[in-house]
Design a protein with these regions (language model features):
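Extracytoplasmic gate region of multi-pass secondary transporters
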Residues: 27-29, 216-264, 271
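Helix-loop-helix hairpin linking two adjacent transmembrane segments in secondary transporters
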Residues: 134, 139-196
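Intracellular juxtamembrane helix-capping segments at the cytosolic ends
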Residues: 119-133, 325-340
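C-terminal ends and interior cores of transmembrane alpha-helices
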Residues: 81-99, 296-308
Length: 403
């Protein structure tokens, strides 16, 4: 077998690993189902996405150190094992004696999901660079597409499980965890049995101090905040879009599960944006494209705040999904280009910025709960306003994008 064919076959289990990376996006759909099952407030339900993304702050840089010690394949394998364990635990919540113990089991599960994803986000791209000598960008884009498939189907499976008249094994929306557990086991075994020759890693991994020192560079600091806003808007939309639809379009007796399709709509347009964006950026000025997609996101925020018709809200979800799909790659590349001699430090710092997914859902929950307490007709408007602050920051970032 030629080296080319061997490399392509080796990429298959790595792409399945990208699929397991998408498990993290089940957090939005699942937190909505949990809010109904456990009677949680908005701020309590939004704590779960925050819990997942908090671990990016803690584990991104240590993962770089770990890769130097045990290698990239073993690090990715570890991340899959942790992620698979995370989706395995909720299958046992029916054995917990109280609602409180069930809730604590979910806290542990979501923490492991965040830890596994933080390790994987940091380690899987370097692993791909060893397997692909040409067309690296297109390969990574395809990996993001595979990840987006998991993101896209997660809310659909959860909604189907919650509403089906013949619940499988009595799991309801938890059927999602069972299916993802099976995929996680396949990914673990396949990658574990796949032989990958790793090149020696020279130099030492970046430490926390090295990364934090890079914040002294204005463009890196601004990019770090930009990454936080991107992920915050991503996680926030994932969590709040069904609530906005229920609030504006729902009738008495409707539940969140009826509007879970909103999350899949978001990820469908995000997936579309990944592919078309990679093509458009080859022909269109990067700053111009960035301006267009951020303006799309701004228009989406207007729709979330003022929209009352179904088409207006669907359009808002589609616009923010498409617009936000390419923000990370552009902001990340701007930071990398600003300090090409410090790629490890910049990369670790940008991944740490993913903990923006912690901050936004918390403030969104606080805002909507406060609005409910004051008797507001549409309390989720204020959750959308929090996301709009992130979009406003990205608008201010436009002049920093190099032509």
């Amino acid at each position: 077998m030629s080296n080319s064919n061997s490399s392509k076959l080796t990429l298959i289990p790595v792409m399945i690993a990208f699929f397991t990376m998408g498990f993290v996006d089940l957090v939005g759909a699942v937190s909505n189902n949990m809010q109904e099952d456990f009677g949680l407030s908005d701020s309590a339900a939004n704590f779960f996405p925050s819990l997942v993304f908090f671990w990016f702050l803690i584990f991104s840089v240590p993962t770089g150190m770990l890769m130097n010690k045990i290698g990239r394949k073993k690090t990715v394998l570890l991340s899959i094992i942790v992620t698979t364990l995370a989706v395995f635990l909720p299958l046992f919540d029916s054995f917990m004696p109280t609602k409180e113990s069930q809730l604590w089991l979910m806290y542990i599960s979501f923490s492991l999901l965040g830890i596994g994803n933080a390790i994987m986000q940091t380690s899987i791209n370097p692993l791909v660079t060893m397997l692909v000598k040409g067309h690296l960008a297109s390969t990574l884009t395809f990996g993001q597409f595979v990840k987006a498939i998991a993101s896209f189907i997660a809310p659909l499976i959860a909604a189907w499980g919650a509403t089906t008249t013949a619940p499988i094994l009595g799991l309801s929306w938890r059927i999602l965890f069972l299916l993802f557990f099976v995929v996680g086991m396949i990914a673990t075994l396949w990658l574990g049995l796949t032989r990958i020759e790793e090149e020696p890693i020279e130099g030492k991994a970046s430490g926390f101090v090295d990364c934090l020192k890079m914040l002294g560079s204005p463009i890196i600091l601004l990019s770090f905040i930009g990454i936080m806003c991107h992920v915050g808007i991503d996680v926030g939309t994932n969590a709040v879009a069904p609530k906005i639809l229920l609030e504006r379009l729902g009738t008495d007796g409707d539940s969140l599960s009826k509007f879970e399709y909103a999350t899949s709509l978001y990820f469908a347009f995000r997936t579309l944006g990944c592919f078309t964006g990679s093509i458009i950026m080859r022909k269109l000025n990067i700053r111009t494209f960035f301006t267009i997609i951020v303006l799309m996101m701004a228009l989406a925020m207007v729709g979330f705040v003022f929209g009352t018709e179904q088409w207006e809200l669907w359009a808002a979800i589609a616009l923010v999904g498409y617009g936000n799909s390419n923000v990370f790659s552009i902001v990340f590349s701007q930071a990398m280009l600003s300090a090409p001699e410090k790629k490890n430090e910049v990369s670790g710092l940008m991944i740490m910025g993913l903990f923006g997914g912690t901050i936004f859902p918390l403030f969104m929950g606080f805002a909507s709960d406060a609005a409910k307490a004051s008797g507001a007709l549409y309390p989720q408007v204020w959750a959308a306003v929090v996301m709009a602050v992130g979009v406003a920051y990205l608008l201010s970032y436009i002049p920093k994008v190099k032509q």
